[in-house]
UniProtKB/Swiss-Prot annotation:
NCBIfam families: cmk (TIGR00017)
Protein name: Cytidylate kinase
Gene: cmk
Catalytic reaction annotation: CMP + ATP = CDP + ADP; dCMP + ATP = dCDP + ADP
Principal location listed in the UniProt entry: cytoplasm
Residues at which ATP binds: G12, P13, S14, G15, S16, G17, K18, G19, T20
Keywords associated with the record: ATP-binding, Cytoplasm, Kinase, Nucleotide-binding, Transferase
GO molecular function ontology, one term from the record: dCMP kinase activity
Amino acid sequence: MNIKAPVITIDGPSGSGKGTIAGKLAKHLGWCLLDSGALYRLLAFAARNHGVDLTNEESLKLLAAHLDVQFLGATENHPQRIILEGDDVTDDLRNEQVGAWASQVAALPAVRDALLQRQRAFQEPPGLVADGRDMGTVVFPDAPLKIFLTASAEERARRRYLQLKGKVDGVSLSSLLDEIRARDERDTQRAVAPLKPAADAIQLDSTELSIDQVLQRILSEIAIRDIAG
């Protein structure tokens, strides 16, 4: 691990806004960005495409080690794009079903082990903003600033509904709330790397906060610690 490159971790449940905040923070600082959830979504998506059983740990571990993936950085006019085996799968990975598959494979110890070093390889100068569910507890336990971002299940479902409304047929607020609660249950109860705040994490409830308010609070913590120089 490159100790010269500081890491800020942002963990939290599905729909808490951690991906949005991490992206904005990385852009503001000019740092690298790790969307760890995308790696699990990629693996689950690739497994389904290759006919790999989502409960077969050894096959998933092998697939994880050889994922042909590229992350194309965001630009002023375009968001980050994710290329799997030569195809742009960015939009496919946002599908709720892919998210459910990702949660399933993320509970497997062999899969998490296979992706651990791949995630740590993102730590490069000038620094890294890493978002996920175990960034501060497992992947980067020595990070100088750890954020645990949450929001009520109802608010997270509402945010997701607004994102999907008009884009996905048949989406309902009640079904999204059920999915989020089920996802929370899987993520917090899994035996390996369960979703929980690191002991030294700063916990932020974004239920009644705007994106900019959350970002400003994190920037204040960065300034206090003089992390970004």
